Amino acid sequence: DLSTINATEYPYLRLDMYTMDDIDRTPVNLKFWRVFYDAAPEAILNKDDTFVFNSDTLQQGQIMEFAIKAENISSNDMDSLLVKYTITNENNETIIVYDRLEPLKSNETQLLDFNYNTKALQGDQQFNFEINPEGDQPEKFVFNNFGVTDFYVRTDRKEPVLDVSFDGIHIINGDIVAANPFILIDIRDENEFLLLDDPEKIMISLIDPNGNEVEYNIASPELSFEAATDLNNNQAKISLEPLLSQDGDYTLVVQAADASGNISGDNAYEVTFRVILRESVSNVLNYPNPFSSQTQFIFTLTGSEVPDDISISILTVSGKVVKEISREELGPLRIGLNRTDYKWNGTDDFGEKLANGVYLYKVNLPADMERYENQYADRFFTKGFGKLVIMR
């Protein structure tokens, strides 16, 4: 009885028989020798039954999908089955993942199902898979326990697209904006596998008129981050609502990177804008002037909020009001340069065409709002009144 021998300590045994006959001096003639034992189980990888590997070329961030069947072809049960997965790159750097499956019973199969996100991989890769590695449990043979396949991870090289707007408007250097602007930073990426979900990959700073720079991050109370959640629309948004407390020129600097580290441009987005705290209207004119069929009004608003009760009056040179253009008719207005959606066609309040000639116009403002401060030498605008000419 050899059951007392530790099989782990003595994994291999050899039985020798020694006989001795002091009388007849004739060796015993052995008729047979029978050994009773529990045979080790035997598992194999059955590629013919099931084998899945989604592609030999994957986009960075795409999930590697692998599946194969393990089968116990012996009459003895196996304990819980250990599986080892190894990914090796061109530099022989390895990623090893172990998985423990249910016990593999005699003549039964189990599915090895392994998915791995390739976001940290790039270039040529080798994938090794092995059941019962490192002699985890007794087995008759191990040569049929492993397999290997190669694949390639295509690196994301395309940069994300960055878009910045102030109160819904794209501005240029020198534009006037509100003292409490709503700045929307929109980042889009074509990658269908790596979401824009890391706010740390977006750098935002604001330089005030004194040259002081403030950096904003996810912890800043003025900032909110909306991560991308849909791979079909890989878009992240940052809302920034700074309170700009002094007059002067500010500079906003923004740089964004996608999940692969591609930056939105060789140079950061940078725009310089002006804040004027006092509420006023200036640089009022109509265009075209003279006009024959229609004209629009252009003016600059400063301060924090657009006044609710702004309107424009059209008058004859004798001072008679012939047309009132209400706030609602003017259309959407903002702090900064405005060009009204409204196009005046040269008619009065009753829809009648006015005669050719010179007319006056005036912007009506709240009592506490400063009047026009035209910065341009404008021969058509004097003492709060502008001149327009109808010429049909």
Q: Over which residues does each language-model region extend?
A:
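Short solvent-exposed strand-capping/beta-turn motif centered on an Asx-Ser/Thr pair
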Residues: 20, 48, 57, 69-77, ...
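Short, compositionally biased P/S/T/A/G/V-rich stretches that sit at domain boundaries
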Residues: 35-59, 152-177, 181, 188, ...
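Beta-sandwich strand segments
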Residues: 24-30, 134-148, 194-196, 259-268, ...
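Short loop/turn motifs at secondary-structure boundaries
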Residues: 68, 106-107, 162-168, 179-184, ...
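Long, low-complexity serine/threonine/glycine- and acidic-rich segments characteristic of extracellular
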Residues: 1-16, 20-28, 33, 85, ...
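Beta-strand-rich ligand- or partner-binding modules
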Residues: 1-79
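Enriched for extracellular/lumenal, surface-exposed ectodomains of secreted and cell-surface proteins
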Residues: 86, 127-140, 255-260, 364-367
